[in-house]
Protein backbone atom coordinates (compact mmCIF):
# COMPACT_ATOMS: atom_id res chain seq x y z
CA UNK A 1 0.00 0.00 0.00
CA UNK A 2 2.75 2.40 0.96
CA UNK A 3 4.52 1.56 -2.29
CA UNK A 4 1.46 2.49 -4.36
CA UNK A 5 1.22 5.94 -2.78
CA UNK A 6 4.87 6.55 -3.53
CA UNK A 7 4.32 5.50 -7.13
CA UNK A 8 1.30 7.76 -7.59
CA UNK A 9 3.13 10.63 -5.93
CA UNK A 10 6.05 10.32 -8.32
CA UNK A 11 3.70 10.11 -11.31
CA UNK A 12 1.92 13.29 -10.26
CA UNK A 13 5.23 15.16 -9.93
CA UNK A 14 6.32 14.10 -13.38
CA UNK A 15 2.93 15.05 -14.82
CA UNK A 16 3.07 18.47 -13.16
CA UNK A 17 6.58 19.05 -14.49
CA UNK A 18 5.46 18.22 -18.03
CA UNK A 19 2.51 20.63 -17.71
CA UNK A 20 4.85 23.43 -16.65
CA UNK A 21 7.20 22.75 -19.58
CA UNK A 22 4.29 22.67 -22.00
CA UNK A 23 3.01 26.05 -20.82
CA UNK A 24 6.51 27.55 -21.14
CA UNK A 25 6.93 26.30 -24.70
CA UNK A 26 3.49 27.51 -25.65
CA UNK A 27 4.42 31.13 -24.75
CA UNK A 28 7.35 31.41 -27.28
CA UNK A 29 6.70 34.54 -29.51
CA UNK A 30 5.88 33.80 -33.12
CA UNK A 31 7.57 35.62 -36.00
CA UNK A 32 5.56 38.47 -37.57
CA UNK A 33 3.66 37.72 -40.74
CA UNK A 34 5.70 38.36 -43.88
CA UNK A 35 4.74 40.50 -46.87
CA UNK A 36 1.88 39.37 -49.01
CA UNK A 37 4.19 38.08 -51.72
CA UNK A 38 6.01 35.94 -49.18
CA UNK A 39 2.87 34.72 -47.38
CA UNK A 40 1.42 33.25 -50.50
CA UNK A 41 4.61 31.55 -51.58
CA UNK A 42 5.54 28.00 -50.64
CA UNK A 43 8.09 27.30 -47.94
CA UNK A 44 11.63 27.78 -49.28
CA UNK A 45 13.18 25.13 -47.04
CA UNK A 46 12.13 22.15 -45.01
CA UNK A 47 13.03 24.01 -41.84
CA UNK A 48 10.09 25.79 -40.28
CA UNK A 49 10.58 29.56 -40.06
CA UNK A 50 10.40 32.78 -42.13
CA UNK A 51 12.81 34.20 -44.84
CA UNK A 52 12.59 37.73 -46.25
CA UNK A 53 12.47 37.76 -50.06
CA UNK A 54 15.88 38.57 -51.61
CA UNK A 55 14.67 41.59 -53.54
CA UNK A 56 13.37 43.14 -50.34
CA UNK A 57 16.50 42.51 -48.34
CA UNK A 58 18.10 45.62 -46.90
CA UNK A 59 21.47 44.96 -45.27
CA UNK A 60 22.04 46.27 -41.79
CA UNK A 61 24.45 49.13 -41.33
CA UNK A 62 27.56 48.03 -39.63
CA UNK A 63 28.16 49.98 -36.43
CA UNK A 64 31.87 50.10 -37.19
CA UNK A 65 31.15 52.07 -40.38
CA UNK A 66 29.71 54.95 -38.40
CA UNK A 67 26.30 54.55 -39.93
CA UNK A 68 27.57 55.31 -43.45
CA UNK A 69 25.99 53.53 -46.33
CA UNK A 70 28.29 50.99 -47.91
CA UNK A 71 29.13 51.79 -51.52
CA UNK A 72 28.23 49.16 -54.06
CA UNK A 73 31.21 49.47 -56.39
CA UNK A 74 29.56 47.29 -59.01
CA UNK A 75 27.02 50.05 -59.65
CA UNK A 76 29.49 52.94 -59.71
CA UNK A 77 30.06 54.39 -63.18
CA UNK A 78 33.48 55.57 -64.18
CA UNK A 79 33.54 59.28 -65.03
CA UNK A 80 33.06 59.92 -68.70
CA UNK A 81 36.40 60.35 -70.42
CA UNK A 82 36.37 63.53 -72.48
CA UNK A 83 38.81 63.57 -75.39
CA UNK A 84 41.73 65.92 -74.94
CA UNK A 85 41.44 69.04 -77.09
CA UNK A 86 43.74 68.84 -80.12
CA UNK A 87 47.08 70.55 -79.73
CA UNK A 88 47.41 73.66 -81.89
CA UNK A 89 49.52 72.95 -84.93
CA UNK A 90 52.97 74.48 -84.64
CA UNK A 91 54.13 76.58 -87.56
CA UNK A 92 57.69 77.66 -88.20
CA UNK A 93 58.17 81.23 -89.41
CA UNK A 94 60.78 82.10 -92.02
CA UNK A 95 61.51 85.68 -93.11
CA UNK A 96 63.51 86.99 -96.05
CA UNK A 97 64.05 90.39 -97.66
CA UNK A 98 64.35 90.55 -101.46
CA UNK A 99 65.15 93.54 -103.62
CA UNK A 100 66.57 94.03 -107.09
CA UNK A 101 67.53 90.84 -108.94
CA UNK A 102 67.14 88.47 -105.96
CA UNK A 103 63.91 86.77 -107.09
CA UNK A 104 65.42 83.51 -108.37
CA UNK A 105 67.83 83.28 -105.44
CA UNK A 106 65.01 83.79 -102.93
CA UNK A 107 62.69 81.22 -104.51
CA UNK A 108 65.54 78.68 -104.53
CA UNK A 109 66.11 79.32 -100.83
CA UNK A 110 62.40 78.87 -100.08
CA UNK A 111 62.37 75.65 -102.08
CA UNK A 112 65.24 74.23 -100.03
CA UNK A 113 63.41 75.16 -96.81
CA UNK A 114 60.15 73.41 -97.66
CA UNK A 115 61.80 70.49 -99.44
CA UNK A 116 63.54 69.08 -96.36
CA UNK A 117 61.28 70.23 -93.50
CA UNK A 118 58.67 68.32 -91.51
CA UNK A 119 56.47 70.95 -89.87
CA UNK A 120 54.58 73.57 -91.85
CA UNK A 121 56.23 76.91 -92.62
CA UNK A 122 54.91 80.44 -92.91
CA UNK A 123 56.98 82.56 -95.29
CA UNK A 124 57.22 86.28 -94.53
CA UNK A 125 58.58 87.81 -97.73
CA UNK A 126 59.54 91.49 -97.70
CA UNK A 127 59.96 92.61 -101.29
CA UNK A 128 59.84 95.60 -103.57
CA UNK A 129 56.46 96.20 -105.16
CA UNK A 130 57.79 95.23 -108.59
CA UNK A 131 58.59 91.71 -107.34
CA UNK A 132 55.29 90.92 -105.64
CA UNK A 133 53.49 89.44 -108.67
CA UNK A 134 56.59 87.45 -109.66
CA UNK A 135 56.77 85.85 -106.22
CA UNK A 136 53.08 84.98 -106.35
CA UNK A 137 53.44 83.38 -109.77
CA UNK A 138 56.45 81.28 -108.70
CA UNK A 139 54.89 80.04 -105.45
CA UNK A 140 51.42 79.34 -106.84
CA UNK A 141 52.72 76.78 -109.36
CA UNK A 142 54.25 74.59 -106.65
CA UNK A 143 52.47 71.19 -106.51
CA UNK A 144 49.74 70.58 -103.96
CA UNK A 145 51.79 68.25 -101.76
CA UNK A 146 54.21 71.17 -101.27
CA UNK A 147 51.80 74.10 -101.19
CA UNK A 148 49.75 72.53 -98.39
CA UNK A 149 52.86 72.67 -96.18
CA UNK A 150 53.26 76.43 -96.49
CA UNK A 151 51.54 79.76 -96.16
CA UNK A 152 53.09 82.96 -97.39
CA UNK A 153 52.56 86.68 -97.17
CA UNK A 154 54.34 89.37 -99.15
CA UNK A 155 55.01 92.67 -97.39
CA UNK A 156 56.21 96.00 -98.79
CA UNK A 157 59.59 97.32 -97.71
CA UNK A 158 58.82 99.43 -94.64
CA UNK A 159 60.98 101.27 -92.13
CA UNK A 160 58.95 102.45 -89.09
CA UNK A 161 59.84 105.82 -87.66
CA UNK A 162 60.79 107.49 -90.92
CA UNK A 163 64.31 107.83 -92.38
CA UNK A 164 63.31 105.37 -95.10
CA UNK A 165 65.89 106.40 -97.69
CA UNK A 166 68.67 106.41 -95.13
CA UNK A 167 67.86 102.89 -93.95
CA UNK A 168 67.31 101.60 -97.48
CA UNK A 169 70.82 102.61 -98.54
CA UNK A 170 72.48 100.98 -95.54
CA UNK A 171 74.91 98.33 -96.87
CA UNK A 172 72.80 96.55 -99.54
CA UNK A 173 69.34 97.60 -100.77
CA UNK A 174 66.72 96.68 -98.18
CA UNK A 175 69.15 94.71 -95.98
CA UNK A 176 68.32 96.87 -92.93
CA UNK A 177 64.70 95.67 -93.11
CA UNK A 178 65.57 92.75 -90.82
CA UNK A 179 66.24 95.18 -87.96
CA UNK A 180 62.57 96.18 -87.96
CA UNK A 181 60.99 92.71 -88.00
CA UNK A 182 60.07 92.81 -84.27
CA UNK A 183 57.95 95.91 -84.89
CA UNK A 184 56.49 94.86 -88.24
CA UNK A 185 55.46 91.32 -87.23
CA UNK A 186 53.66 92.03 -83.97
CA UNK A 187 51.64 88.81 -84.09
CA UNK A 188 54.67 86.54 -84.58
CA UNK A 189 56.38 85.14 -81.50
CA UNK A 190 59.54 83.64 -83.03
CA UNK A 191 61.16 83.80 -86.43
CA UNK A 192 64.13 82.63 -88.47
CA UNK A 193 65.57 85.32 -90.73
CA UNK A 194 67.91 84.33 -93.56
CA UNK A 195 69.59 86.15 -96.42
CA UNK A 196 68.44 85.33 -99.94
CA UNK A 197 71.72 83.50 -100.68
CA UNK A 198 71.10 80.80 -98.05
CA UNK A 199 70.31 77.13 -98.76
CA UNK A 200 68.97 74.60 -96.26
CA UNK A 201 70.70 71.22 -96.44
CA UNK A 202 68.74 69.72 -93.54
CA UNK A 203 65.25 70.29 -92.07
CA UNK A 204 64.50 73.82 -90.94
CA UNK A 205 62.97 72.09 -87.89
CA UNK A 206 66.48 71.40 -86.59
CA UNK A 207 67.59 75.03 -86.46
CA UNK A 208 64.13 75.99 -85.16
CA UNK A 209 64.78 73.67 -82.20
CA UNK A 210 67.49 76.04 -80.94
CA UNK A 211 64.68 78.22 -79.58
CA UNK A 212 64.17 75.63 -76.84
CA UNK A 213 67.80 75.93 -75.84
CA UNK A 214 67.55 79.63 -75.06
CA UNK A 215 67.98 80.43 -71.40
CA UNK A 216 65.92 83.10 -69.63
CA UNK A 217 67.97 86.01 -71.02
CA UNK A 218 68.69 84.89 -74.59
CA UNK A 219 66.50 86.27 -77.36
CA UNK A 220 68.47 85.70 -80.58
CA UNK A 221 70.95 83.23 -82.08
CA UNK A 222 73.66 83.70 -84.70
CA UNK A 223 76.87 81.96 -85.75
CA UNK A 224 80.35 83.49 -85.43
CA UNK A 225 81.61 85.61 -88.30
CA UNK A 226 84.83 83.63 -88.22
CA UNK A 227 86.39 80.77 -86.28
CA UNK A 228 89.94 82.12 -86.15
CA UNK A 229 90.40 85.63 -84.81
CA UNK A 230 93.77 86.12 -86.54
CA UNK A 231 92.14 86.02 -89.96
CA UNK A 232 88.68 87.32 -88.99
CA UNK A 233 87.46 90.61 -90.42
CA UNK A 234 86.14 92.16 -87.20
CA UNK A 235 89.20 91.29 -85.15
CA UNK A 236 91.47 92.93 -87.75
CA UNK A 237 89.52 95.84 -89.24
CA UNK A 238 86.45 96.83 -87.18
CA UNK A 239 86.37 100.38 -85.77
CA UNK A 240 83.35 99.74 -83.58
CA UNK A 241 82.45 97.33 -80.76
CA UNK A 242 81.55 93.78 -81.83
CA UNK A 243 80.46 90.57 -80.14
CA UNK A 244 83.08 88.20 -78.74
CA UNK A 245 86.47 87.82 -80.41
CA UNK A 246 85.36 87.45 -84.04
CA UNK A 247 81.90 89.04 -84.21
CA UNK A 248 78.74 87.32 -85.46
CA UNK A 249 77.24 86.93 -88.93
CA UNK A 250 73.60 87.95 -89.32
CA UNK A 251 72.86 86.01 -92.53
CA UNK A 252 71.12 83.34 -90.43
CA UNK A 253 69.43 84.84 -87.38
CA UNK A 254 66.96 83.07 -85.11
CA UNK A 255 64.86 85.49 -83.07
CA UNK A 256 62.37 85.38 -80.24
CA UNK A 257 60.50 88.50 -81.31
CA UNK A 258 58.37 88.65 -78.18
CA UNK A 259 61.43 88.88 -75.96
CA UNK A 260 63.04 91.46 -78.24
CA UNK A 261 59.93 93.66 -78.10
CA UNK A 262 59.74 93.46 -74.30
CA UNK A 263 63.43 93.87 -73.47
CA UNK A 264 65.40 96.99 -72.54
CA UNK A 265 68.94 96.98 -73.91
CA UNK A 266 72.09 98.34 -72.35
CA UNK A 267 73.94 100.85 -74.52
CA UNK A 268 76.64 103.53 -74.38
CA UNK A 269 74.33 106.41 -75.29
CA UNK A 270 72.28 106.87 -72.13
CA UNK A 271 72.52 105.26 -68.67
CA UNK A 272 69.03 103.75 -68.88
CA UNK A 273 68.10 100.84 -71.09
CA UNK A 274 66.33 101.41 -74.39
CA UNK A 275 63.78 99.28 -76.18
CA UNK A 276 64.74 97.80 -79.53
CA UNK A 277 62.70 100.38 -81.42
CA UNK A 278 64.04 103.30 -79.38
CA UNK A 279 67.63 102.20 -79.83
CA UNK A 280 68.02 101.59 -83.57
CA UNK A 281 68.18 105.08 -85.04
CA UNK A 282 70.32 106.71 -82.29
CA UNK A 283 72.71 103.76 -82.53
CA UNK A 284 72.99 104.18 -86.29
CA UNK A 285 73.56 107.92 -85.96
CA UNK A 286 76.37 107.34 -83.51
CA UNK A 287 78.23 104.70 -85.53
CA UNK A 288 77.25 105.35 -89.17
CA UNK A 289 80.72 106.67 -90.01
CA UNK A 290 82.42 103.58 -88.55
CA UNK A 291 80.38 100.68 -89.87
CA UNK A 292 81.08 98.71 -93.04
CA UNK A 293 78.58 95.85 -93.08
CA UNK A 294 75.50 97.91 -92.25
CA UNK A 295 72.84 96.18 -90.18
CA UNK A 296 75.19 93.32 -89.24
CA UNK A 297 77.57 95.82 -87.64
CA UNK A 298 74.69 97.35 -85.68
CA UNK A 299 73.71 93.90 -84.39
CA UNK A 300 77.30 93.28 -83.31
CA UNK A 301 77.30 96.57 -81.39
CA UNK A 302 74.00 95.71 -79.69
CA UNK A 303 75.20 92.30 -78.51
CA UNK A 304 78.59 93.66 -77.49
CA UNK A 305 76.75 95.58 -74.78
CA UNK A 306 74.25 92.73 -74.16
CA UNK A 307 76.20 89.48 -74.61
CA UNK A 308 73.95 87.55 -72.23
CA UNK A 309 71.09 87.95 -74.71
CA UNK A 310 72.76 86.06 -77.58
CA UNK A 311 72.92 82.33 -78.19
CA UNK A 312 75.80 81.38 -80.51
CA UNK A 313 75.27 78.27 -82.61
CA UNK A 314 78.04 76.35 -84.42
CA UNK A 315 79.51 77.44 -87.73
CA UNK A 316 77.94 74.63 -89.78
CA UNK A 317 74.59 76.42 -89.37
CA UNK A 318 75.95 79.35 -91.41
CA UNK A 319 78.68 77.90 -93.61
CA UNK A 320 80.31 80.44 -95.92
CA UNK A 321 83.25 80.52 -98.36
CA UNK A 322 85.44 81.95 -95.59
CA UNK A 323 85.20 78.57 -93.85
CA UNK A 324 87.01 76.75 -96.65
CA UNK A 325 88.70 79.19 -99.06
CA UNK A 326 91.64 79.66 -96.66
CA UNK A 327 91.64 76.02 -95.63
CA UNK A 328 89.00 74.16 -93.66
CA UNK A 329 88.37 76.06 -90.43
CA UNK A 330 84.88 74.98 -89.35
CA UNK A 331 85.44 71.91 -87.19
CA UNK A 332 81.72 71.47 -86.59
CA UNK A 333 81.14 71.07 -90.35
CA UNK A 334 83.92 68.49 -90.56
CA UNK A 335 82.09 66.46 -87.93
CA UNK A 336 78.44 67.11 -88.79
CA UNK A 337 78.55 68.28 -92.39
CA UNK A 338 77.17 71.59 -93.64
CA UNK A 339 73.64 72.22 -92.33
CA UNK A 340 72.95 75.67 -93.84
CA UNK A 341 74.97 76.89 -96.80
CA UNK A 342 75.46 80.66 -97.10
CA UNK A 343 76.76 81.61 -100.52
CA UNK A 344 77.71 85.22 -99.87
CA UNK A 345 80.18 87.11 -102.06
CA UNK A 346 77.98 86.19 -105.06
CA UNK A 347 79.51 82.71 -105.35
CA UNK A 348 76.30 81.18 -106.73
CA UNK A 349 76.69 83.26 -109.86
CA UNK A 350 80.40 83.12 -110.71
CA UNK A 351 83.11 80.49 -111.01
CA UNK A 352 85.12 81.38 -107.91
CA UNK A 353 83.57 78.71 -105.68
CA UNK A 354 82.07 75.94 -107.86
CA UNK A 355 81.29 73.83 -104.78
CA UNK A 356 78.77 76.44 -103.62
CA UNK A 357 77.44 76.98 -107.11
CA UNK A 358 76.81 73.24 -107.51
CA UNK A 359 74.34 73.22 -104.63
CA UNK A 360 72.54 76.27 -105.91
CA UNK A 361 72.08 74.89 -109.41
CA UNK A 362 70.85 71.41 -108.44
CA UNK A 363 68.29 72.80 -105.96
CA UNK A 364 67.18 75.51 -108.40
CA UNK A 365 66.68 72.97 -111.20
CA UNK A 366 65.07 70.25 -109.08
CA UNK A 367 61.36 69.63 -109.64
CA UNK A 368 59.37 68.46 -106.66
CA UNK A 369 58.13 65.24 -108.26
CA UNK A 370 61.60 63.95 -109.11
CA UNK A 371 63.55 61.36 -107.15
CA UNK A 372 65.84 63.13 -104.69
CA UNK A 373 68.83 60.87 -105.23
CA UNK A 374 68.58 60.66 -109.00
CA UNK A 375 67.74 64.30 -109.67
CA UNK A 376 69.70 66.01 -106.91
CA UNK A 377 72.29 63.94 -105.09
CA UNK A 378 73.90 62.18 -108.05
CA UNK A 379 74.15 65.39 -110.14
CA UNK A 380 75.62 67.08 -107.07
CA UNK A 381 78.33 64.43 -106.82
CA UNK A 382 79.15 64.86 -110.50
CA UNK A 383 79.48 68.62 -110.15
CA UNK A 384 81.80 68.20 -107.17
CA UNK A 385 84.19 66.19 -109.33
CA UNK A 386 84.62 69.36 -111.37
CA UNK A 387 85.53 71.43 -108.30
CA UNK A 388 88.35 69.37 -106.78
CA UNK A 389 90.90 71.91 -107.99
CA UNK A 390 89.51 74.50 -105.52
CA UNK A 391 90.14 74.61 -101.77
CA UNK A 392 86.43 74.22 -100.96
CA UNK A 393 85.99 71.48 -103.56
CA UNK A 394 88.75 69.40 -101.95
CA UNK A 395 86.56 68.60 -98.95
CA UNK A 396 83.42 67.09 -100.54
CA UNK A 397 82.66 65.07 -97.40
CA UNK A 398 82.08 68.33 -95.50
CA UNK A 399 79.55 69.54 -98.08
CA UNK A 400 77.83 66.24 -98.85
CA UNK A 401 77.66 64.50 -95.46
CA UNK A 402 74.63 66.29 -94.06
CA UNK A 403 72.56 66.49 -97.22
CA UNK A 404 73.06 62.76 -97.75
CA UNK A 405 71.70 62.13 -94.25
CA UNK A 406 68.80 64.45 -94.97
CA UNK A 407 67.87 62.72 -98.22
CA UNK A 408 67.95 59.30 -96.58
CA UNK A 409 65.74 60.62 -93.80
CA UNK A 410 63.25 62.09 -96.28
CA UNK A 411 63.23 58.89 -98.35
CA UNK A 412 62.60 56.69 -95.30
CA UNK A 413 59.84 59.01 -94.14
CA UNK A 414 58.11 58.92 -97.50
CA UNK A 415 58.34 55.12 -97.64
CA UNK A 416 56.83 54.77 -94.16
CA UNK A 417 54.00 57.17 -95.00
CA UNK A 418 53.34 55.30 -98.25
CA UNK A 419 53.23 51.92 -96.49
CA UNK A 420 50.88 53.23 -93.79
CA UNK A 421 48.54 54.68 -96.40
CA UNK A 422 48.40 51.29 -98.15
CA UNK A 423 47.65 49.50 -94.88
UniProtKB/Swiss-Prot annotation:
It is found in: Membrane. It is an enzyme of class 2 (transferase). GO terms for cellular component: membrane. Keywords: Glycoprotein, Glycosyltransferase, Membrane, Signal-anchor, Transferase, Transmembrane, Transmembrane helix. Its EC number is 2.4.2.42. Residues 27-423 are lumenal. GO terms for molecular function: UDP-D-xylose:beta-D-glucoside alpha-1,3-D-xylosyltransferase activity; UDP-xylosyltransferase activity. CDD domains: GT8_like_2 (cd06430). GO terms for biological process: O-glycan processing. Coiled coil: none annotated. It comes from the Eukaryota. The keyword ATP-binding does not apply. Residues 60-85 are annotated as: Disordered. InterPro entries: Glyco_trans_8, Glycosyltransferase_8, Nucleotide-diphossugar_trans. Gene3D superfamilies: Spore Coat Polysaccharide Biosynthesis Protein SpsA, Chain A. Residues 1-6 are cytoplasmic. It is a single-pass type II membrane protein. Glycans are attached at residues 215, 256. Belongs to the glycosyltransferase 8 family. This is Glucoside xylosyltransferase 2. The gene is gxylt2.
Amino acid sequence: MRFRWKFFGSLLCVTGLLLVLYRQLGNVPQPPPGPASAQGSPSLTATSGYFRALEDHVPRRDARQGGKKKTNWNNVRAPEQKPNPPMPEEWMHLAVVACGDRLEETVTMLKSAVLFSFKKIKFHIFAEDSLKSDFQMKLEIWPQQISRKIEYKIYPITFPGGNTQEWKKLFKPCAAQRLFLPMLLQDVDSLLYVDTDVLFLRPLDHVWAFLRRFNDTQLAAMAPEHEISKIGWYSRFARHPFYGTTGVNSGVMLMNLTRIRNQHFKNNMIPAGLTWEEMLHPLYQKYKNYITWGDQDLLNIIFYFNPEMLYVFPCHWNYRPDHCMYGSNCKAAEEEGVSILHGNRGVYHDEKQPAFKAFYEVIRDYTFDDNLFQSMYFPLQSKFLESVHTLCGRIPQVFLKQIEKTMKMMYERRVVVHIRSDV
